[in-house]
């Protein structure tokens, strides 16, 4: 069982970012219960790139915390490539402050959330959102973090 991480740091300042080992751990804890072998690219970007991708792929004219791009192999081809996560540093940092969450916990949550999207989970419908949030909470707590949705539940 292993998750292969391709970490891309496309930010002006890399200081204070989680380590490659932390990203790998968060991916592994999220993905391996569902898929024991996988390759995932995690790209950390600044707001301009996040904004452009969010506008191009989702029609949203603003940067966002995490974008997930699942990979679909052509029929008959078996590949471990799960997909790409694009995480915006400034949005994650701003949200952590606004939501009064430890920064490291919010980074972990974005990796967990994005990874579940790569695995096919979504939160468009209420029942899907409930299932996905429950999984996120369980995974985060298994890693020693608090429930990322605690403030919303109070």
From Swiss-Prot:
Family annotation (SUPFAM superfamilies): Metalloproteases ('zincins'), catalytic domain
Cofactor info, note text: Binds 1 zinc ion.
Cofactor: Zn(2+)
Keywords: Cytoplasm, Endonuclease, Hydrolase, Metal-binding, Nuclease, Ribosome biogenesis, rRNA processing, Zinc
Gene Ontology biological-process entries: rRNA processing
Molecular function (Gene Ontology), one example: RNA endonuclease activity
Compartments where located: Cytoplasm
Enzyme Commission code: 3.1.-.-
GO cellular component: cytoplasm
Binding site for Zn(2+): 113, 117, 123
Keyword NADP among record annotations: no
Family under the similarity heading: Belongs to the endoribonuclease YbeY family.
PANTHER family on file: ENDORIBONUCLEASE YBEY, CHLOROPLASTIC
Role according to the record: Single strand-specific metallo-endoribonuclease involved in late-stage 70S ribosome quality control and in maturation of the 3' terminus of the 16S rRNA.
Protein name listed in UniProt: Endoribonuclease YbeY
